[in-house]
Amino acid sequence: MGNGSGRRRGTIGGGRHEAGGRSLVVILDGTLSTLDTGRSTNAGRIYKLLHDLPTGQRPSVFYEEGIQFSTWRDLRHVITGTGINPQIQRAYGFLASRYRPGDRIYLFGYSRGAFAVRSLAGLIDRIGLVRPRFATERMIRQIWRLYRTDPHGAHAQVFARTFCDPGVRIELVGVFDTVKALGWRLPGLAARAERETAFH
């Protein structure tokens, strides 16, 4: 598991699309939490349980560990929770590229990951989930800008009618120890974090 963000990410399942739809599961973990023994959370345990299902019963799952501390440059993100927005966009891209009519969406998160999946649910509810053929990085950045600036405006409504699937429903949002993305309120860092995450 790996990605450009420096966090481990895992996907399981997601092969063929069965009649009656399939389950798409997003699991976002908390700060400093991983799948490693002694650092796993309820979010990580859910991922492991799904991973251990027989191959034919596994849903399509996206898991991403929380913000990690590997160098001093990571300290600001660990303290304030900044950097959560790209995580939400990656999870959105996973869903948008795989969703087909009839699929069921389940979102799970722990701590800041709980905040993230709630925001992801808000993004899908307010604007929508783009159809798979439109699930490009550029399109996801565009819908993110709409969500940040004017999710109820005319532009967002036109975007939703043009690019989004109107029948998307979220079956469940399961959160553990949900918090605001902003962590410790240090001068300067707190103000910047508020600007980056207040729109959620």
Predicted ranges, named:
Residues 2-200:
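Alpha-helical segment proximal to the catalytic Tyr-Lys
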